[in-house]
Amino acid sequence: MNTETRRVTDKRERPLRDLRISVTDRCNFRCTYCMPAELFGPDYPFLQKTELLSFEELERLAKLFVGRFGVEKIRLTGGEPLMRKDMPELIKKLARIPGLKDIAMTTNGSLLPVYAEKLKQAGLHRVTVSLDSLEDERFKAINGRGVSVNKVLEGIEAAKAAGLGVKINMVVQKGVNEKDILPMARYFKEKGHILRFIEFMDVGNTNQWNKKDVITKAEIIDLINQHMPTEPIEANYKGEVASRFRYLDGSGEIGVISSVSDAFCASCNRARLSARGELFTCLFASSGYDVRKLVRGGLTDDELTESIASVWRNRTDQYSIDRALSKTDGKKKVEMSYIGG
């Protein structure tokens, strides 16, 4: 068995460096831009347990991505990852993998008061919490379940108290929550957490995306600069998706993820593994590659490694660049709740 780490690049010379694992397609929220309640109702056919990759299967795949391809970062997503039973057990398995330097999780934060300490003890390093408003009634409307913003704020504080790194992501939509840009910036500036604004993206097929509803990075930063001046700073690492800005008074930083106005396809090094076990090479992909079938089909680690490498070598995705060139109209895409953000 060949256990040597090798560099694999795609058709555009982009290396594989980052793995995102969706552990469930279920969520306890029904956010309008991700899992709108009218489409994801009580009769929606969510994946059954046997359809999900088991923790042992996920561990095996993670070991290959880290040991064979040199992946150093794994992010756990959903749906809402904490809806998957016994998540600390999966994190323990991942934390034992030699060479894996960073284990992160994207979550809506509502279950962190229960799980934050257990996640930290298991080996999780940091969380990114999705929060789109501090105004309670607006937040309840956005999450579609009437969950109070206080529940998420409690989760953020629980994560901080447990010693987890914390960042906040806010999806900004014109006509929905642009009034929250400044209150969110002020609040998390005072709390000492990095807030990242995300341009409203056309992920999936159900969020009624229209470019007119996008508030761009330039507009967001211009608004903040009028009240709390910032200056741009360099990325932490090659391929970082957020543009970083530092407050001039030295009180921290913010970021903007601007997939619509600034395509970052050229440096994208992320592979995404869905809860069903399909490998996707782009957040905006139409289809994935059935890795679960290979895992359950008796392939050796060497054979599985070569199959994954072949998928990456043939990757040509550059959806955000194509969008800017109006080459994506009518393209059907996988839903974000299935592939993870």
Swiss-Prot record:
Pathway the protein contributes to: Cofactor biosynthesis; molybdopterin biosynthesis
CDD domains, per the entry: Radical_SAM, Twitch_MoaA
Gene3D superfamilies: Aldolase class I
Keyword ATP-binding: no
Domain spans labelled Radical SAM core: 11-231
Job of this protein: Catalyzes the cyclization of GTP to (8S)-3',8-cyclo-7,8-dihydroguanosine 5'-triphosphate.
Record protein name field: GTP 3',8-cyclase
Gene: moaA
